[in-house]
Design a protein with these regions (language model features):
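Short beta-strand/loop motif that positions the catalytic acidic residue
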Residues: 3-5
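Glycine-rich beta-alpha junction loops
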Residues: 7, 39-40, 120-122
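Catalytic histidine neighborhood in serine/cysteine hydrolases
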Residues: 24-51
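C-terminal, loop-rich substrate-recognition/catalytic regions characterized by aromatic stacking residues
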Residues: 44, 49-339
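Alpha-helical scaffolding segments of alpha/beta enzyme cores, especially the outer helices
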Residues: 18-21, 72
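Acidic beta-to-alpha connecting loop that harbors the catalytic carboxylate
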Residues: 7-9, 292
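Conserved alpha/beta-hydrolase "acid-adjacent" motif
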Residues: 10-17
Length: 339
């Protein structure tokens, strides 16, 4: 069996990763392979896989997959040719460096779970926050939701999963945290966990967390000699690496929704889909937090009512506070790969 998926599969970014993991856990004797490329849904079969939106991947990743993984796999099972041992257990493309990596298992065994903390003054770092930090806050208004893309589209776009996030960074209902300029590469391999300490003024809210790669101010793509595609400037581009959402009422149990107590600090913890990305030296890591992502995610009335039957009058503003002090630290658990 071979599970094939895309890092930027807007239809099902969850499936391929987790089918592979489930088979490894529940049926370890099954011959099982995983291939993840920098693709949207089905891009490995229907497009060249050189780019998605403005972000380039350096080569025809779809053709590489077909020649080096798909054909050998079907030659073995359909024609009895070749050796299945030539196909690694996990083959994953890492954006940022634009390289394929081979692993004996996914997530790799040599990752170290590392906390990336929200800190004062919109800072992000690997050290615990200092004492005395006041929470950051914003007002989430369902009548003015944060859009998922800067353009106006009839259909949901594929490109939003690598879109430039600068269009939301200056909104007052989006919190932005970023590291200093990285002095060395940081490679992430596996699922990310968002662990937030929050309070809200109402009884429900959504929490959208976005992990972003901030390109240097002088970054530009050169002309591609293979494809003849012209170069272009990417100065300060804020590439969405992974984004996910937790509807707050389900923070403790998906079967038993639970209202928030207004003003009371609560933990909102959830697992985001797997990431395979290298944050390069000279870049920055950014985290954005918001409470709407419209129309990708339906609007939350921010009130503990049945969302499917509620009325317009149920939709209300909510003041959201995100805490980042030693007793109420908020952070992302990052699977850092040591190569």
């Amino acid at each position: 069996m071979m599970e094939v998926g895309g890092l930027f599969d807007a239809e099902d970014c969850f499936g391929a990763w987790n089918v592979y993991k489930a088979i490894e856990k529940q049926s370890p004797a099954t011959s099982n392979r995983l291939v993840i490329g920098p693709w949207f849904h089905g891009q490995w079969a229907g497009a060249d896989g050189t780019h998605l939106g403005n972000v380039r991947f350096g080569s025809n990743t779809s053709l590489w997959f077909q020649q080096n993984r798909e054909i050998p796999f079907f030659n073995y099972y359909l024609k009895g040719k070749g050796n299945l041992d030539s196909i690694p257990k996990a083959t994953v493309f890492f954006t940022g460096e634009n390289e394929w990596h081979e692993f004996k298992i996914w997530p790799p065994q040599d990752v170290q779970l590392t906390n990336l903390y929200l800190q004062a003054n919109n800072q992000l770092g690997f050290t615990q926050p200092a004492s005395g930090n006041n929470p950051d806050e914003y007002v989430s208004d369902p009548a003015k939701p944060v859009p998922y893309t800067s353009g106006i589209h009839e259909d949901r776009t594929r490109e939003y999963m690598t879109d430039d996030q600068r269009f939301t960074a200056n909104r007052t209902d989006v919190l932005v945290y970023k590291t200093d300029t990285l002095k060395e590469d940081i490679t992430i391999a596996g699922p990310i966990t968002a662990d937030l300490q929050v309070s809200i003024s109402t009884t429900d809210a959504d929490f959208v967390v976005k992990l972003i790669d901030v390109f240097p101010d002088d970054f530009a793509y050169e002309e591609d000699a293979n494809t003849q595609k012209p170069g272009y400037i990417m100065n300060g581009y804020q590439m969405l690496v992974r984004g996910d959402v937790m509807r707050g009422r389900y923070r403790n149990n998906f079967e038993k929704p639970e209202a928030f107590i207004p003003g009371q600090i609560s933990k909102v913890k959830f697992t985001m889909n797997d990431v395979a990305h290298k944050f390069k030296k000279g870049h920055r890591i950014m985290v954005q937090i918001q409470s709407s992502w419209f129309p990708l995610v339906d609007r939350n009335p921010q009130k503990m009512v049945d969302i499917y039957t509620c009325s317009d009058s149920d939709f209300q503003k909510a003041t959201i506070k995100i805490y980042h002090d030693p007793d109420h630290a908020s952070f992302l658990v990052m699977p850092v790969l040591h190569e």
